[in-house]
Amino acid sequence: MVSLQAVQQANVGIGSLPAGLVALFMGATSGIGQSALHHFAQHASSPRIYSIARPSAVRSHETFLDSLRSSNPSGTYNLIEADVSLISEIDRIVADIKENEPKIDILFMSAGFMAFEGRKDTREGLDPSMSTRYYSRLRLVQQLVPLLNNAPSPRVVSVLGGGLESPLNEQDLDLRDPKNWTFWSSSMHSGTMGTLTLERIARANPNLSIVHWFPGTVATPGLVRANQFGMSPPNPTSADEAGQRWAFIATNDRYAVRGGLVPVPIGLSPVQKSGGGIFLVDPAGEGSNNERVLAGLRKRGVDDAVWRFTEGIFASAAKAGRSSQAKDEL
């Protein structure tokens, strides 16, 4: 396990990295994401930060960004208002980023929730608990690959269930049949499909370091909701510690396909990639081996099937978005 002390000591080195790192955060309005953004901004030199907030969270998140402006006035903090359960909104976000930045150094994604109340599809016909945890995340990475590849040591960190992948319902990947959908199955499908598709992106972009991190149980607003539905995991990690650990994972060469960021702490060794080419990281900051599940999925071509299916979802969402826009203009 990587001790919190080692994490904190290493994170001081973030301040020695080149000034002007560009970081995009999706899911930083509360919980792990907000803590991660806080700790990154605390250490980074003149960072250029973009943070996405859903409409209902804009006011509170702007207040939070104001606190970062006060604590590190050398940075630039930009709020992007968007509903990330919609693929069309992701495309708009990417278009805005591309107009303002030639590169992205760090992409952080933790948006999402467990739909304890049941499935309620978006206007694009998707389960929002899956779109925030899978479709929108993949779309964001996919569309930002050119900007990520323009950075010297790009890093993507998706916070969900790296190392916890499980068999998929291959006949109903988006769990559209009500008999197949539960809040748990939607979570497991999101995590497993996320790993398989991120591996595909990593294989096509060998200089891009991609981490799928399972942070364990963390004391966040999401955990409060889980408690209301009878789920009470013991001994949760504080959001503050989780944010510090994310800053370590996002900037340390321990989780890199090549060096260029903060050196690996003395006494620790680089984490090994999964068989598919990404870093699956557990709550202790160590590599997680789940080849027992993943190797079989790859061997049978399930990763390719998931990719093709997801491309179809993106095409359908784009069509639904255009149809909705046309109706709004009538």
UniProtKB/Swiss-Prot annotation:
Q: Where is the signal peptide?
A: none
From the Swiss-Prot or TrEMBL record, state where the protein is found: Membrane
Output the GO biological process annotations, alphabetical, semicolon-separated: alkaloid metabolic process
Q: Looking at the keywords, is Lipid biosynthesis present?
A: no
User: What InterPro entries does the database record attribute to this sequence?
Assistant: NAD(P)-bd_dom_sf, SDR_fam, Sec_Metab_Biosynth_Oxidored
Key word NADP present in the record?
Answer: yes
Known uses: Notoamides have been shown to exhibit antitumoral activities. Notoamides A-C show moderate cytotoxicity against HeLa and L1210 cells with IC(50) values in the range of 22-52 mg/ml, but the IC(50) value of notoamide D is greater than 100 mg/ml. Moreover, notoamide C induces G2/M-cell cycle arrest at a concentration of 6.3 mg/ml.
Where, by residue number, does NADP(+) bind? Answer: 12-17, 38-42, 59-60, 80-82, 160-163
Q: Which GO terms describe its molecular function?
A: oxidoreductase activity
Q: Where is this region: Interaction with ASS1?
A: 158-202
Q: Which residues carry a glycan?
A: N180, N207
* Keyword field: Alkaloid metabolism, Glycoprotein, Membrane, NADP, Oxidoreductase, Transmembrane, Transmembrane helix
The residue ranges crossing the membrane are 12-32
Q: What is its EC number?
A: 1.-.-.-
Q: How does it sit in the membrane?
A: Single-pass membrane protein
Cellular component (GO) terms are: membrane
Q: Which family does it belong to?
A: Belongs to the NmrA-type oxidoreductase family.
Purpose of the protein: NmrA-like family domain-containing oxidoreductase; part of the gene cluster that mediates the biosynthesis of notoamide, a fungal indole alkaloid that belongs to a family of natural products containing a characteristic bicyclo[2.2.2]diazaoctane core. The first step of notoamide biosynthesis involves coupling of L-proline and L-tryptophan by the bimodular NRPS notE, to produce cyclo-L-tryptophan-L-proline called brevianamide F.
Name this polypeptide is given: NmrA-like family domain-containing oxidoreductase notO
Q: Which organism is it from?
A: Aspergillus sp. (strain MF297-2)
